[in-house]
Amino acid sequence: MADTVEEPQLQNGAAPAESETEQNPIPEPQLQTEPKLTGEIPEIEADLTPEEVQSEVTDAKPEEVQSEVKPEEVKTVVTDAKPEEAQSEVKPEEVQSVVTDTKPDLTDVDLSPGGSEEIPIRSTEVEQESTTSVLKKDDDGNKTFTMRELLSELKSEEGDGTPHSSASPFSRESASQPAENNPAMDLINRIQVNDEEGRSRQRVLAFAARKYASAIERNPDDHDALYNWALILQESADNVSPDSVSPSKDDLLEEACKKYDEATRLCPTLYDAYYNWAIAISDRAKIRGRTKEAEELWEQAADNYEKAVQLNWNSSQALNNWGLVLQELSQIVPAREKEKVVRTAISKFRAAIRLQFDFHRAIYNLGTVLYGLAEDTLRTGGSGNGKDMPPGELYSQSAIYIAAAHSLKPSYSVYSSALRLVRSMLPLPHLKVGYLTAPPVGNSLAPHSDWKRTEFELNHERLLQVLKPEPREMGRNLSGKAETMSTNVERKTVKVNITEIVSVTPCADLTLPPGAGLCIDTIHGPVFLVADSWESLDGWLDAIRLVYTIYARGKSDVLAGIITG
């Protein structure tokens, strides 16, 4: 699997809090775009709008599948996204029927790839306050303006004629207009909006564009002004109707991409620019459908998310959006390359979750991509290398993530719809059932020969070892024949209560038997177990952490309702 981000441990019973910001950037990432087979998990459309970052204008889209994220709310989640939790629209797609005896019919929900939204960083919404007001001066005393200041200046200009304060950063420049031959300004000036609210919003954007154009004329190396101007163009693209020709949405996005390119050349460490640039490219790719040109754009978007993550490895939103872009790309690349791209997407979603355990959008997106992989494996029979998980196990894993996302956000209709589709794939009345190798209870230093591979069950309350009764010879009957019978002699079993967990981590230790080591640290001490493979370990790590996170968020009753009916 692709490179992942180091995962934090649960500390003192608390998981990292999730960012509730929503995205409003450009692209509307959706779950995997093509619904296939019996049932598809609903896509989550995301509104992405620039959010306020550094210069205060930054935000992006995707998953819940769409959420607003600003520069610190970055566009992320469901490949196509705009603001997420509060603004994300979830539109389940029609599901195609699947012909298979191994899985239930899925007809109500769209689990196709792309069901999440990308989270934007930019934010130019009128009611949005800038949180990072960065006003940088160049040598001539020019400033890069924040959205809040621009709005304040606009109100002053359109008000009752009250003169501007001498302290206003715009008082000396309001009359200044950029050159008429500026192609970006020409595009913005030609935008026609039908409704009054849209016209008012566009006036603000045009006003801001003039300010940034003037700032760049005075100082062409002002990367903050270039970045903010790109956000204005990206936001203006959202204000253009889909059938508009002059200017088109794509024209504005293309111009925004040019500004991001210039800004990042001047300042290669501008994380927010790479993040929002990737969102703009994703929107351009969506416009082109499943074409070679779209494939190239998706690859460019993935490259920019990679650069964003390199600059800010702690960005779960960028990782989530990166996974969504790869999910979209997997629908276009040649069949021989698809599995590799899908598995890389899985690694990005998993890395996002391990940075933020309650990031329900990434959790849901991981469920949908696993569902799609199960469909492909069922249809093609897998790669034939003998290491692939069987479709049934992939479906079960998919259901675990979707159930967890629903438990964290039970009010999201898209999660509810998807859960109805996959709930029967869970090993009810448990969330997960599988095999782990465990030492004798209370003796983790026992010889490897004493460790036994046994079944474990995980529900909303505990992880429990299941020991089956062993038959043993009791003697001979009256006819002289040996007679055996089962005995239910009580034996100690490994049991870990969710409420007692401190951390859950992988471990590699020579004292453990061969396999993928797992350490569950509890208030009573560590519990060591060994999974059959590292891929199997990923499933156990995520499942236990998610159950703990659901408990820490006070949602255990929701999970209990799912698995107990």
Curated annotation (Swiss-Prot):
Organism for this UniProt entry: Arabidopsis thaliana
Disruption phenotype: Hypersensitivity to latrunculin B1 (LatB) and cytochalasin, reduced primary root length and root hair growth defects.
GO cellular component, one term: early endosome
Residue ranges, compositional bias (Acidic residues): 42-54
GO biological process, alphabetically ordered: exocytosis; root hair cell development; root hair cell tip growth; root hair elongation; vesicle-mediated transport
Free-text note on domains in this protein's UniProt record: The C-terminal domain (496-565) is responsible for the localization to the trans-Golgi network/early endosome.
Localization of this protein: Cytoplasm; Endomembrane system; Golgi apparatus, trans-Golgi network; Early endosome
Gene: HLB1
Protein name (record): Protein HLB1
TPR repeat spans: 189-222, 237-270, 282-315, 326-359, 361-391, 392-425
Amino acid composition bias (Basic and acidic residues), ranges on this chain: 58-94
